[in-house]
Every structure is written in C-alpha cells, then in structure tokens.
Amino acid sequence: MAKKLYIETHGCQMNEYDSSRMVDLLGEHQALEVTARAEDADVILLNTCSIRERAQDRVYSQLGRWRELKLANPDMVIAVGGCVASQEGAAIRDRAPYVDVVFGPQTLHRLPEMIDAARISKLPQVDVSFPEIEKFDHLPEPRIDGPSAYVSVMEGCSKYCTFCVVPYTRGEEVSRPFDDVIAEIIHLAENGVREVTLLGQNVNGYRGLTHDGRLADLAELIRVVAAVDGIDRIRYTTSHPLEFSDSLIQAHAEVPELVKHLHLPVQSGSDRILAAMKRNHTALEYKSKLRKLRAAVPGICISSDFIVGFPGETEKDFEQTMKLIADVGFDFSYSFVYSQRPGTPAADLADDTPEELKKERLNALQHRLNQQGFEISRQMVGSVQRILVTDYSKKDPGELQGRTENNRIVNFRCDNPTLIGQFADVHIDAAQPHSLRGSLIQ
C-alpha cells in the first residue's frame, strides 16, 4: 500500500508554490501520495509563515495537535519547513521535541534525504541554510493542477524594511536564470496551463542571467513569457514600488497578455511612517508611478498591502493613509495590524499604539477599501468579461467560476465542465461583496 503525505501550508503564494514542489519531490523520490487526513499520513509536512505573530503561534498550536498522532505512530515523520523553520531552526524542537525534520525555504530540495536520515538514524535533521537558488536544480518538473500556475522566478529580498523578516528567513534576492524560468513555463503551457503568476518576494527586482551573459529584467521576462504558445494571461506578485520601472509600465501598455491588475504594496500613506519602515519612497512618489501607469493603461485596477499601528503612528499618519487610499482608488488590500517580529529593527521600537485603537483603524481602513472595491465591481455590471474558467463554484456545484483580468471571481450557471481550463465570455449580471455573478454568452 502506498505511503501517505499530509501537507498543511500557511502564508503567501510563495509558500503555496513551495508546497506544490514538495509534493512533486516526495512523489517522485518516495512515491508518497497526498492524503487529506493527517491521521492517515506516514509523513506530515507543515510549511510555515512568520510574517505575522498569529501565523507563528499557529505553528505551535498545530504541532501540539499532532503530538498525539506521533505518540500513536512513532514511525510517522513530522517535518516543519518555511519561514518559521528558517527563523527558529533547531529551537523548534525545544517546544515540539517530536518534530523529526526542520528545513528552510532554500533547502526543501533536501527533504527526501532528510526524511530518510531521520528514519534510519532516529535523530533530528535540521538544515535552514541559504544555498543560492540551488533547490531549483534538484526539483522535478512541476505537477499540473488546473489552468493557472505559479512560477517562482526569484527568492529572498534585499530591501530590509524595518518590519519584515523575509531577508532573514529567505535570504537576499537571488534570481533564477532566465532560460530556466522560460523552460518551466513552456512545460506548463504544453500541459494545459493558460495563465501563469510570476512569483518573488520582490518580483519586479528580477534580474535573470540569460544564455548570452546579460541580465534580463522582469519586463523582458514578461515579453518572452507572452510569446510562449498557449500562455494567454500573465500576472506577477509581489512588487516593491522602488523597482516599479518605466520598462514595466511600457510592458503593461504593450503586452496584451499582462492583466489589467497590479498588486503594489505601499504599507502606509504617511511619509514619516514610510521613512521609519525604510521603504525609501514617499507617498507622492508612489502616486506618481501609478499616474504614469494609468496614463498608459486606463482602467487598470490597483491593490496593495497596509500595516496599521506601526510604532509611532499618530492619528494624522493614519489619516494620510486613508487619504492615499481615496486618492489612488485601491480596490483591495491585504491589511494587518502591526505585530513585532523578533530580529527586525522595528522590534526595538516602542509598540505604543493601543491594540484597540489599532483594530479600530484597521476596521475603518478595510471598510473604505470594501466600499471602493464594491463600487468598481458595480461599475462592471452590464459589461461582458473574458474570464478564465478555473473550477466549479465553491458554493454551488451547478455553477462554474473563473477570474476576470482585474482579478475578480465570477460565478455563473453552466452544465458544461469541459469549459474548465478555457476562456469564456460572461455577461456580468450583479456585483456582490467579494465576487460577481454572470451569465455565459453562448
């Protein structure tokens, strides 16, 4: 009987991508098959996130729940990867001594041998080092799971924002070779993928070495990806405003496969807070780049990230953030209350905003963003949108769902499952808080 793998993923799209590659790797090297039940597993993997305090707490809560499974089945291997593993290393075993393997984002390619070593030696295996992009040389071809796919083009970040753990948990920026990225995307396209999302912690800082020794930027990569037969849509995330270049704006204007949506995290609308965060740009500089983009691509939708309650944030600082939200017209954001992350420069600052006030500000910010996003959705009612049909609707098996160019989910009634993986024209009938309803145009 085949051995079983249970995997749980916390955090960002990069973690989702890494988890999919772990499944590929362990399927090829150890013939492990994925199970939906941890109690049935021979190997349990937890791919962790350390961006937020609660995400880190979740790790130890989850490991605590698996302790009984390990006691019942001592041969079970429990492995912890991702950014919490990178940050804490062997110290994870101080709180969860039944963990067998601890590995970082850059050493996931060593997972099969680490699992084997743990089984044979009965000793814990820990490797949270930062070998430069080596993991991609050891991974099998990616498994295809639907018409959309993530492709990691770079790892790490060298910006060292004062609130962020990424440079310490994933290392500094390292770009994958240009031809390696294109080869992976060709493989995906040959197997039915129609949309790719290019991933990196600072993806628009991509500088990939080409076969002739040049460094290609993200704009050049996008143009070549768009020329791959079968690829009809391109997205990328996550970007830093400093790296949002004129060449990228030109690519948005000239490459029809590049969607009319940009996720460009700003974190705050206050220049004082932006300086304290070491973002190295002002709110005006951020808005100026978006004005150029919108002049080149009218109608493009912009989403962002915000941190509320950063140390020293005053009411005036928060009002400036709310003004930026209104000025730009963001339609969505990943927004969080600030929490101290150990080892970051901001952790040395006084976290002096009361938690209740942080929550009030976060609620006000999210309410404003929800209003703006719904208004954009409402304006789409009556239009015809070309959507990539990705799956059955999560709420009604008699419906299919897909995404618009500007990243909105559309649900529509359809009894033809062969549309999944294809593009379809859908008339938008109604706007809902977090999705659209439509009718298939036959």
UniProtKB/Swiss-Prot annotation:
GO MF term set: 4 iron, 4 sulfur cluster binding; metal ion binding; N6-isopentenyladenosine methylthiotransferase activity
TM segment ranges: none
Gene: miaB
PANTHER family (UniProt xref): CDK5 REGULATORY SUBUNIT-ASSOCIATED PROTEIN 1, MITOCHONDRIAL TRNA METHYLTHIOTRANSFERASE CDK5RAP1
Domain MTTase N-terminal: 3-120
Protein name: tRNA-2-methylthio-N(6)-dimethylallyladenosine synthase
A cellular component term, taken from the record's GO annotations: cytosol
Family the entry assigns: Belongs to the methylthiotransferase family. MiaB subfamily.
Domain Radical SAM core intervals: 143-375
Class of this enzyme: transferase
UniProt main location, coarse: cytoplasm
Keywords assigned: 4Fe-4S, Cytoplasm, Iron, Iron-sulfur, Metal-binding, S-adenosyl-L-methionine, Transferase, tRNA processing
